[in-house]
Amino acid sequence: MSYSTMLIPAVEVIITLILAIFIGLIIPGIERRYVQARIQQRIGPPVTSSGLWASVKFLYKENIKPNSPAPGLYKAMPILCFIAVLMVFLCVMPQNYAFLALANLIAIVGFLKVEETAYVLMGSLSKSVMSGGLRFDDHIKGAIRQGLLVSYLEDISSSRSLRMIIFGSFPLYLALFIPAVQSGSIYLGDIISYQQAHGPVIFTLAGAIGAVVFFVGYMILLNEYPFSIIKAKSDVIEGPYMELASKYRSFVVLTRGFLIVTLGLLFAVLFIGVPPKLFSLGIIVDLIVILILPVIMAVCSAFSPIFTNRQFYPTVLLSTLLGVLAIGIAALF
């Protein structure tokens, strides 16, 4: 293989990565200005303020030392999240389909699990000043009950993150394997080849149900309303992000936008059969999917309260059952 033959795909991946990160920084502004603000009948912030300029602004903010038993590990978690999302992005890129150990659904699920687990660690490693006045119960000398376990906002957020990993991730991961059952392979290249021969999975009954289940899992993974329980402003405020400042907060903003784009590309590959090839017409389909999913999410979020356990568990259970049903239909037909 010549040097130029190897260089061109690498350059294409790098350019696509830069565009994906840029689009990811613009999407939050589109959500807030053109969807949520219109629903609430207000002008809304500039498109670039919520993502692009927010990430730049945080770079110039003063860093703080978190009140953590392992401050270095705590501050490294946003970087770990970004790396995990980057690996999912590389799995989706068609230039990497020859690397079977990378371009398969098992690897994608593993990297997404790393991203989810990071929030559990962040919550357990942070003990912010915001939690200092919320000790349960009274620890003042002479109190009736003493020596009880001190509870922190971040501990609550960490336990919620663990709950999201155990229960909330079922819909997304079931949806990912519906195209695999239909195509008979967990490798992205085979799934795309199947759809090129038989048509997009989303136009089948199993695929249509799977797309709905995927979207529910998409919102859960992004911790968006009504599933924003790990950083609910009403009780845990910012949750695991509480003590992240400066460049570490920039990584939080950057990673969320990048994850939105990456999940959109993953949906396009699995349910439509269009890989993100930069210099092809198919990239237009990918861009449409990337934009449509967060717009629908913003509409749902604008009309949704934060779910409590009473609403969260039935929603996840129903979505999981739909995912199982779709897999059964895909296996039979």
PLM regions: where:
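Juxtamembrane/interfacial segments at transmembrane-helix boundaries in multi-pass membrane proteins
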Residues: 2-9, 82, 99-101, 176-207
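Alpha-helical transmembrane segments
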Residues: 10-25, 99-114, 199-221, 281-282
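Membrane-interface amphipathic/juxtamembrane segments adjacent to transmembrane helices
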Residues: 31-62
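Cytosolic juxtamembrane amphipathic/interface segments immediately preceding
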Residues: 56-73, 148-159, 240, 244
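Hydrophobic alpha-helical transmembrane segments in multi-pass integral membrane proteins
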Residues: 174-179, 323-333
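Membrane-water interface at loop-to-transmembrane-helix junctions
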Residues: 197-208, 236-261, 281
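Alpha-helical transmembrane segments of helical membrane proteins, especially in multi-pass transport
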Residues: 220-221, 227, 247-281, 289-298
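Interfacial loop-to-transmembrane junctions
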Residues: 297-323
